Amino acid sequence: YEQLTTVIFGPGGSRKSFLGLWLALLVENGVALEGAVRAVPGRTLYLDYEADQATAEYRLGRFVDGNPALAHASPSYRRMKQPLAADLPVLSASIVEQGIVFLIVDSLAMACGGKDLSDPSTAVSYFSALRQLPCTSLSIAHVPKNTENPMIYGSVFFTNIARMTWEIKCQTDEDTGSSTIGLFNRKANERRHRPMGLQFAH
């Protein structure tokens, strides 16, 4: 949703970070992914709490190797060292200065700064911080272990406040390293989207 919040959630190793970078690359280059990403190009910013710039650049490079049409523009990158709310003044200024239209937060739990994710106030504070940033956002979240009904880890308010949520499922071929990804729209404030499938070749 334009100017609103979407959350993608799934277990570790389900290629959530890959997907976040891929979506950022599509927006940067104005390439549409039906049902998920608009075709109008725009600047994107990737907030990384989990890895480093070298890792992000390597992954982006692999995407471009397989899709040369995406070589024209690349997302801005920021390695995060403190909670999202604590970085708001600098982030807001940077978003305005660079004309950022799409923000990826990887990951939601780290961006909350170690607060109790089961506490509703943590979810409220997180989304309140996002609303102060003048752009559309995608947050990448984990799921609880050993549950039959996967949901965003922590308070149900992470789901309730998000305008849209997608569950990601992944199967990786151990021989080739290629991953088949399924995306399932679990919540939509306007209308639900059909499931989507992607394949990332190693």
At which residue positions do the language-model features occur?
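Conserved inter-motif catalytic segment of the P-loop NTP-binding fold
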Residues: 12-14, 38-121, 125-128
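Active-site catalytic microenvironments for nucleophilic, acid-base chemistry
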Residues: 26-30
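Pre-Walker A (Motif I) flank of P-loop NTPase domains
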Residues: 2-6, 42
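Hydrophobic positions on the alpha1 helix immediately C-terminal to the Walker A/P-loop
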Residues: 19-23
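Conserved Walker
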Residues: 31-39, 149-155
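Phosphate-binding/switch region of NTP-binding enzymes
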Residues: 7-8, 13, 17-18, 102, ...
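Conserved hydrophobic/aromatic pocket- or pore-lining residues that grip, position, or stack substrates
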Residues: 8, 24, 46
